[in-house]
């Protein structure tokens, strides 16, 4: 989950929508990424985060490969400079 900076020209909603567009565009382009879906927060509150990514991988190795894939790294760089806070949870079904 990401919470974006509030002191930018872009609003957090604009950043979240652009991140959604970029991450979901990776579907079908990175081996091992079965599905990437971004949810954008629909209700503003002080404790709410702005966006969440749900991504499915067939293995931990596929997740590791995704993290360093050049197409993903471009999105990471876009988000990193706009991010106030980020948390993640990796779990196995």
Q: How would you describe each model-predicted region?
A:
Residues 1-50, 58-65, 91-93:
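Short S/T/G/P-rich N-terminal loop/turn motif that feeds into the first structured element of a domain
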Residues 60-85:
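C-terminal structural segments of small proteins and small subunits
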């Amino acid at each position: 989950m990401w919470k974006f900076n509030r002191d930018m020209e872009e609003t957090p909603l604009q950043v979240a929508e652009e991140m959604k567009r970029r991450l979901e565009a990776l579907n079908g382009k990175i081996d091992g990424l079965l599905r990437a879906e971004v949810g954008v927060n629909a209700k503003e509150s002080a404790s709410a985060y702005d966006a969440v990514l749900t991504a499915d991988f067939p293995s931990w190795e596929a997740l590791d490969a995704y993290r360093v894939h050049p197409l993903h790294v471009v999105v990471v760089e876009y988000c990193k400079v706009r991010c106030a806070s980020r948390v993640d949870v990796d779990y196995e079904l």
